[in-house]
Amino acid sequence: MATYIVSGLCFLLLLLAPVSAAAQGKPPGEGKGKLVISLQDAIKRTLAVSNRIKESRAGVDASLSLKGQADAARWAQIDANLFGGPSTKNELRSDTGIIDSKTTTSDIKVNGVFGRAVIRVVQPLYTFNKIGSFREAASRGVRVSQAAVGQQASEVVLQVKQAYYGALLASDTRAFLKGLLKDVRDSLKTTERRVEAGSAAATLGDVYQLRSFAARIEKGIADAGEGHTIAMDGLRTLMQLEPGVQFKLVDRNLTAAAVALRRVEDYEQTADEIRPEFVQLREGIKAREALVEAAVADRYPIIFAAALADVAGATNRDRSRVPIITDPLMHTQGGFFLGLNWHFDFGITEGRIDEARAEHMQLIYKKDFADLGIPFQVRKAYEEFQTATANIKNTKDAYRNARRWLVTAVANLDLGIGEVVQLTQAFILYIEFRVENFRAIHAQRIALANLDFATGEAVRSFTVQ
């Protein structure tokens, strides 16, 4: 009999172990006062303060800046150089019909200063779609960054649900075990009285078994309490509540979700349409295609129009009236012209094209993997929900019947016609099926959360801004 009790208690330990682990969802917070928080409250608060989401939003700002740069490449660019310095003496003469100077480079005399301004305006006219490709890539990049915000938000929502439902699971388990502990202690007192009275209906072995069983339940209560503390602290961290803030959950118990699921194919279609990772991949592939086109455009020239103004003046120079002579320190010139800028190298451009094509293929292969992996994730969550829903009903029937057996065993023990081994067996089965029922409800809630995550519906109404 003792062997049976020990094995039963070991099974109970294994049964209760996931309670603490299930409560360890990840973390939100604020000021002072008693807060009563629902699941939706926790989700809204976390989405509002999450640093991971803020980081992703900063990524959107960076992408918008890149898009602004790409768009601005269509317009003229202006370069202005202004400089000045000492001016050397320089006197031209042409007494013999040959233009020369009284001063030479070996006879430098500085007796003045000069200033010069060179302004160049360049307007691209035709770039073989290089600028257009960069603009397309930048525009797609913004959408990729926005989808990344949705991805982070979806993960945050899942973590909040894990912590919230984990706290309820731990709370329900602890409350159940506390109530059961009272029944065990009552049976222990009855058994101890009979042993003291010398009744043949009870032995010291029965007393030791019930004491051991009570201690094991106390450990289960402590484990569930630890799980509840971890889950609540996780919610506090996710919501970024300050340590002094007291809060409790609106829901007092973990209840099954009354949801009629659609066909699994409908959920797969939804995932394909709105799942942030799919959006990222689709937009990312198009962005990479545009970058390949931009790299190919580097093979060809850029045709542009330009305007140039070059003005210089010096205190010790006279303006030259000879058309073929331009004094670099004393002149005024400018004009408009068309130009062509063509860069040549021996392998760099082709290497960049190959690199862009390889990066494009990387995303294509990643999407191929997602096309298989994400639908599997949807189907897995769907099946887990169905299984958990069935288990809720089965374990409910099981623990109710186990409870009836337990009531009968307690009554028989009180009447002196029952055995402790029967009572212990009834306790073990009742604990097993009741905790399994809690776990089935928790599994159903988490499966539904995973399904929302897998399809992208968890953040369907979430906005990037």
Question: What feature does the model see in each segment?
Answer:
Residues T3, I37, E155-T270, E384, ...:
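Periplasmic alpha-helical coiled-coil/stalk elements that build and connect Gram-negative outer-membrane
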Residues G25-L35, N81-Q123, D251-L261, E293, ...:
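Small/polar, glycine/serine/threonine/aspartate-rich low-complexity segments that form flexible
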Residues K44-K54, D61-Q77, N111, V118-A137, ...:
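A glycine-/polar-enriched beta->alpha junction
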Residues A23-G84, K89, L125, A201-V207, ...:
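Bacterial Sec-pathway N-terminal export signals of envelope proteins
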Residues S7-A17:
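Bacterial N-terminal signal peptides
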Residues E55-A70, Q152, V156-L177, D186, ...:
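Amphipathic alpha-helical coiled-coil segments
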